[in-house]
A protein has these predicted regions:
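An N-terminal, well-structured beta->alpha segment
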Residues: 1-68, 146-179
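Gly/Ser/Thr-enriched, mixed-charge loops and adjacent short helices
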Residues: 2, 13, 107-233
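N-terminal small/polar loop signature for handling phosphorylated ligands or for N-terminal nucleophile
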Residues: 32, 36-37, 42-106, 194-253
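Short glycine-centered, acidic/aromatic-flanked micro-motifs in structured strand/loop junctions
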Residues: 46-48, 181-183, 254, 335, ...
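Proline/glycine-rich low-complexity loops and linkers
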Residues: 74, 125-159, 163, 254-327, ...
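Short beta-strand-to-turn element immediately C-terminal to the catalytic PLP-Schiff-base lysine
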Residues: 111-114, 251-255, 332-334
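Phosphate-binding and adjacent anionic-ligand microenvironments
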Residues: 239, 277-467
Length: 467
């Protein structure tokens, strides 16, 4: 049983003793602290398809009403839908009930500001302080809040995607795509069919019932996607699409059943955006170098941010990035909003593929396959490892020593905004400590998986030798 309180929200497994799991008492306390912090009068609440979602929703909504807030309950909704709804409704904040890619027994509260964006680290820390202080003041009977059910925001989200200038509805419709989509038995099965209908895309949905009974591990990684990959290998589809339970992460599968590569979701969409809009890009330190290569090809500047969506969006605003995101399949397109959005990613990717296909036909070719599009990008491989430590280990001191070692060496660039990233001319390795476990996560990238894994293990040995 697990309960994790952090600056980004509260998450945990359902059931068990108070203080050890995500339970009604902690939900009340944390929701109250958020309401006290955010101020104002109106809060949007949306949830993914998790089994525990209704229970958590009822506690959250009742607590907000008890604090005097008027709640707009948008029902089953993706994370980006809820983010957009905050702005569209002119609300003071929002609560997303989702544990993203975590297994079915998990749930969480993710907290938004009035812009529909995640709270900053400082704001999240203040909510935690208020929750621990428990100095709460609830509304008197004549000042209790209300709850309004409004299920229009899924369609409004779709409409906003269709209105984006770079979403080429005509080219997509003419291409007559046929796609296979795994929506993991969550909210993607509700909203994505309507998006495909609006785009003129023929689709087949796998795991499309919004029951929260996930058909497989919900993280959209290759090891979890054999069902749709096998389906794609049977033929008849142009593209495979996979989303996580709250539809902020996106992975593609080529027409032959091979993975497009989760890291390359953002790379491919950025390449399309940059071909139409000059500008800069941002991703986090643990994301593929391919985004930098593509950005520089188009004359833009790439900047790395600390891991975490709020860090990426903050850096995007600083450098005026026209596209950004995270290598886990998260596409952030400011023309829509500052949040990871799989609907935006799908529409832009299909636009790119459709336009390339049209150009190919003009040259006497049959069009552009997804695998052919993937082959146009620089090819890198990322290895992921971890170093297990004892609770007594001073992780920060170890990372400082690693930084000093390579800074003195001069053979690589060293970045310490989030752990330590060591950037060599043809490869990189990133070490960062976990906020919840006594471990150091080790990400490394090179042109082959063997080279990437070897680099990661070399740095792991450096750390072991320091203990």
């Amino acid at each position: 049983m697990t309960l994790i309180k952090s600056i980004s929200g509260i998450r945990g497994t359902i059931g068990g003793r108070t203080g050890d799991t995500l339970n009604p008492l902690d939900i009340v306390k944390f929701t109250t602290a958020y309401a006290q912090f955010i101020g104002g009068k109106k809060i949007v609440v949306g949830r993914d398809g998790r089994i525990s979602g209704l229970m958590v929703r009822n506690v959250v909504v009742g607590t907000l009403m008890g604090m005097g807030y008027d709640v707009i309950d948008i029902g089953y909704a993706t994370t980006p839908t809820t983010e957009l709804a905050v702005r569209m409704a002119g609300a003071d904040g929002g609560i997303i009930i989702t544990a993203s890619h975590n297994p079915r027994q998990w749930n969480a509260l993710k907290l938004l500001n009035s812009e529909g964006e995640f709270l900053t680290a400082a704001d999240g820390a203040e909510v935690l302080r208020l929750a621990e202080a428990e100095d709460f003041n609830y509304a008197e009977v004549d000042k209790l809040g209300t709850c309004t059910i409004d299920d229009s925001y899924n369609q409004r989200h779709i409409d906003s995607v269709l209105a984006l200038k770079l979403v080429d509805r005509e080219a997509i419709s003419k291409r007559k795509f046929r796609v296979c989509v795994d929506t993991i038995n969550s909210v993607g099965g509700i909203i994505l069919p309507d998006l495909f209908k609006a785009l003129g895309v023929d689709y087949e949905i796998l795991n499309g019932d919004c029951t929260g009974d996930f058909a497989h591990n919900p993280e959209p990684l290759e090891k979890n996607l054999h069902g749709i990959m096998d389906k794609m290998k049977q033929g008849g589809f142009d593209l495979g699409i996979v989303v996580d339970p709250d539809v902020d992460r996106l992975a593609f599968i080529c027409e032959d059943g091979t993975m497009f590569g989760e890291e390359y979701t953002l790379v491919s969409v950025a390449d399309y955006v940059l071909s139409h809009t000059a500008g800069n890009t941002v991703s986090n330190l643990s994301s593929t170098r391919a985004l930098r290569d593509v950005t520089e090809k188009h004359g833009g500047k790439y900047t790395a941010a600390a891991v975490g969506e709020v860090n990426v969006t903050t850096k995007m605003k600083e450098v005026g990035a026209v596209i950004g995101g995270e290598g886990n399949g998260g596409v952030i397109y400011p023309e829509s909003h500052y949040g990871r959005d799989a609907l935006v990613g799908i529409a832009l990717f299909l636009s790119s593929l459709a336009q390339r296909s049209a150009e190919g036909r003009l040259q006497g070719k049959k069009g552009c396959k997804v695998s052919e599009l993937r082959a146009t990008f620089p090819d890198y491989q990322i290895a992921k490892n971890r170093i297990d430590l004892t609770p007594e280990t001073d992780v920060d001191a170890i990372l400082v020593k690693v930084k000093e070692m390579f800074a003195q060496d001069g053979s690589a660039q060293v970045n310490d905004i989030d752990g330590v990233k060591i950037d060599f001319p043809d490869r990189w390795v990133h070490l960062r400590k976990s906020n919840t476990e006594p471990i150091i996560r080790v990400y490394s990238e090179a042109q082959t998986m063997e080279q990437a894994d070897e680099l990661g293990k070399q740095l792991m040995q450096v750390v072991y030798d320091m203990q």
